[in-house]
């Protein structure tokens, strides 16, 4: 057998083995989808999130107003969290979800200003006023290290303009669609545009 043919066959076998291993690994890993929905109440879908003192699911009459079969399917096949602690504003809650840390540990306890650091003269100097950064133990990075491809879609508001958290790709997402430092659209009907083009109707 000539060297060129032997080399080609060895490479083909090696590639086939690698693809087989990759396929087997992919089948062992479940897909992970996390929805973080702003201002959605525990009674705003047909999935009941209330529980009694023993942890049994309790349906509220308002749950009957909605028909959300896909959410029901996700809840039945996935994990539903019904006991948790949330901050009074979104930035600390979002940072806790991304890091798995309590707000007292990641030191984000206030809303992150989209345009600049919002620490006043009374704010603690050692506190985190700019949100997520690449040195924090964020779960998208852990997923990347485990071989996952990660994508962020929608509102991010992980950090202010100029900070690492401004771009979700800096904190572990391979792909970012729509996420930036802005925490809300320019207007409900987008008449002033979205995100960084707020106030610029021509765009």
How would you describe each model-predicted region?
Residues 26-203:
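Formylglycine-dependent sulfatase
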């Amino acid at each position: 057998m000539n060297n060129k043919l032997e080399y080609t066959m060895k490479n083909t076998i090696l590639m086939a083995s690698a693809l087989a291993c990759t396929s087997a690994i992919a089948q062992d890993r479940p897909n992970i989808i996390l929805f973080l929905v702003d201002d959605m109440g525990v009674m705003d879908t047909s999935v009941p999130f209330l529980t009694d003192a023993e942890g049994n699911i309790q349906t509220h009459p308002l749950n009957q107003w909605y028909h959300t079969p896909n959410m029901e399917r996700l809840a039945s096949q996935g994990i539903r969290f019904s006991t948790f602690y949330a901050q009074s504003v979104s930035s600390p809650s979002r940072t806790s979800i991304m890091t798995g840390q309590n707000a007292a540990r990641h030191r984000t306890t206030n809303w992150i200003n989209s345009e600049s650091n919002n620490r006043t003269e009374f704010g603690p100097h050692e506190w985190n006023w700019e949100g997520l950064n690449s040195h924090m133990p964020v779960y998208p990075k852990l997923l990347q290290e485990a071989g996952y491809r990660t994508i962020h879609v929608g509102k991010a508001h992980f950090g202010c303009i100029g900070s690492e958290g401004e771009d979700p790709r800096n904190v572990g997402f391979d792909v970012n669609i729509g996420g930036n430092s802005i925490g809300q659209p320019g207007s409900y009907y987008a008449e002033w545009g979205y995100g960084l083009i707020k106030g610029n109707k021509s765009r």
